[in-house]
Amino acid sequence: NNNVSVFAGVHKGFAPPTNRTGQDAESSINYELGTRFRVKKLYAEIVGFYNDYSNMLGSDLAASGGSGTLDQFNAGEVRVNGVEVLLNYNVLAETSKFKVPVTLSYTMTNTEFLNDFASTDGTWGTISKGDEIPYISKHQFQSSIGVEHEKLEATVSGRFNGKFRTQAGKGSIPANELVPNSFVVDFAAKYNLNKYIGIIGNINNVFDTTYLVSRVPAGLRPGMPFFASAGLVAQF
C-alpha cells in the first residue's frame, strides 16, 4: 500500500576507550520498529526503539560536575527504550496557494542502569541497579503551526521538555536534583526576494521565559533567553 509502510532496523554501536588500562570499549545494539502512513492530509510516523548497551563509557568532565581529569570509566550495562510519534497535517485544501502545516511530535524515553558501580563524576556518582540516567527527560513534546507561500514562510513552534533528574537515581526526584518542566515558544520566518535570495529571521524564546537546563557545573544554569537574529540566504 502506497499510503502505509513498515520499517525496522538493527544497528551495532561502538566507541573505543582511551589508552588508560581497565577501560572497555562502549558497545551497543540498537533496535527500531516503526510505521509511516498517510490518511488524506494527515501524515503520521510511529517508531519504537530499544538500545541495549553491554557497556557504556562515561567521562570525568568538569562540565558535568566531575574533577575534570577526562578519565573514562565503565558504566556497564544500560537499557534505553521508548517511542517517538510524529503527526503532520495541512489545514488548507491541497489546491490552495497557501499551506498551513500543523506538526506535533512526542518522544517518551525510559533509561535504566542494569548493574552497580561507582565513579568520580559528579553527575553519575554511585550507581545502583535500576537507577535512571541523569539529564534525560522522560517526556518531550514539540508543536508548530506555519504559513507557507511562494514568497513567504513563517512558523511558530513550542518546545516542552519534561522534568528530569541531575543525579542518577530512581523513584521521585529530590528537589535539589530536579530540573523542572519547561515550555518555550520560538518563531522563524523567511521571505524570498527572488528564486536565489531570501531574508530570514528567527526569534528564540519569544516570551523571554526563564527556565532551567542544568545544575552543573557550579549550580543552576538557565536556558537561552530572548534572542533575535536576521540574515540573508542565497541558493544557486
Residue ranges and their predicted role:
Residues 17-24, 56-64, 109-122, 166-173, ...:
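Outer-membrane beta-barrel translocator domains and adjoining extracellular loop/strand segments
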Residues 6-9, 27-93, 97-117:
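Membrane-embedded beta-barrel scaffold of Gram-negative outer-membrane proteins
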Residues 1, 5, 43-45, 99-101, ...:
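Membrane-spanning beta-strand positions in outer-membrane beta-barrel proteins
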Residues 73-168, 198, 202, 207-208:
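Gram-negative outer-membrane beta-barrel transporters
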Residues 54, 99-101, 113, 160-169, ...:
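C-terminal beta-signal and adjacent terminal beta-strands/loops
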Residues 2, 35-39, 89-91, 147-149, ...:
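Residue-level signature of outer-membrane beta-barrel architecture
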Residues 29-33, 44, 71, 81-85, ...:
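Hydrophobic, lipid-facing positions within transmembrane beta-strands of outer-membrane proteins
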